[in-house]
Swiss-Prot record:
Disulfide bonds: none annotated. This is Midnolin-B. Residues 388-397 have a biased composition (Basic residues). PANTHER family: MIDNOLIN. Residues 187-254, 331-372, 388-427 are annotated as: Disordered. Its main location: nucleus. It comes from Xenopus laevis. Facilitates ubiquitin-independent proteasomal degradation of polycomb protein CBX4. Plays a role in inhibiting the activity of glucokinase GCK and both glucose-induced and basal insulin secretion. It comes from the Eukaryota. Residues 20-94 form the Ubiquitin-like domain. Keywords: Cytoplasm, Nucleus. Residues 363-372 have a biased composition (Basic and acidic residues).
Amino acid sequence: MEQQPSVPRSCTNVARETPMNLNIQSTTGTRYELSVPLNETVDGLKRRISQRLKVPKERLTLLHRETRLSSGKLQDLGISDGSRLTLLPSVEAGLMSQMSRPEQSVMQALESLTETQVNDFLSGRSPLTLALRVGDHMMFVQLQLAAQQSGGSHLQHRHVITRGADAGAPPQYRTLHTSTSALSHLASCTPGSTPPTTLSPTSSTHCDAPHSSPLTTSVFRSHGEGVSPCAEQVPCSTRGTEGTSSSPSSRSRKPGAIIESFVNHAPGVFSGTFSGTLHPHCQDGAGRPRRDIGTILQILNDLLSATRHYQGMPPSLTTLRCHTQCASQARNAKATSPQSTGPQQTTHPVGHCQAQTRTCKPSGDRLRQTENRATRCKVERLQLLMHQKRLRRKARRDSRAPYHWMPTRKSSRTSSNSSTSSGEGSLEIDFEDSLWKPDVKAELNSEFVVA
């Protein structure tokens, strides 16, 4: 008698572990089966369907026996093995599509990823491509991480997401952006193991990383309000490099990312480098990134936070030359000047180099002025072309008119008609003079006077 209750308990445990099959039927005619656990919720079922159909779960509506499924467990709603669910399409009309915020697009793109895609991406086995929508504009972001390797060998075109206090040098990323606004930095973290064909080598320098914001969508909201129109759909690819040894400065770096260089290759296509360290709450006890979409979201969030700290344009050859000259002059001044002399002899070349660097460093205001000047020239040229087009249209219309009543053309007509008969000339002059009476008197030849 005492052994009988143990048998149904084991049976119930086995029954709980066995999944149940659901028949999903859409109103458009699509039918397929989906295997879910017995304790699955409505939200989890919508997430599975959205991952399979590549549709945001907010646009999915499920019906079971004419009842809309909104929340709760499937078993509590009377859904069992072999149940049939109806999938309704979501139709948007009017300006509803423009009301979606950028952070919703990011979250929808991340939530549509399967667990296999997230694991393969974070482990570096395969790249990940996200399609982001901001209003009526699309932007494709390709992310790729390098597989973490043990040992201190030099890794080229790879990077490792590490903890800021326990790992080595922070990773450097090279990015290729697709938009022309602050949101363009979102399409950035795509380091890969193979160099892309559309990317030219750029320089990278180490700087202190800014403080990263928490894992929320507030940064997406703040940057999404002032975005400008994005460019056309251009796929992105990146690569990165990592140093060999760690330094005390790199160990003490705060979690986050910082953009080090930025190059505009073409309208809507950008490349650059940035370095950063993953936040500790996105890592496990061994320092590896967590297999979750929150890790990907943190990387994007750190990049958006880095855009606010990045000011200025990419360093040109002149700027790099100025920095090199200043460093060499300062080193020579410190080596050659005796310690007994005052600081006046050493501060002059350094101050001169600083002024030279200040003049060589391009600023954002200068770029904006150049863009405004180019836009103004384009507008003036368009106005000139439109004015010429109006003049040609007016001349064409005047040539087709049966009579020419413009007073400014009277003298030209009288001079051209001087070879005609005197009767016709006198009639035309008397007729026009009686109507218009221009201020400038026409020159009359002798034949008109005789008539």
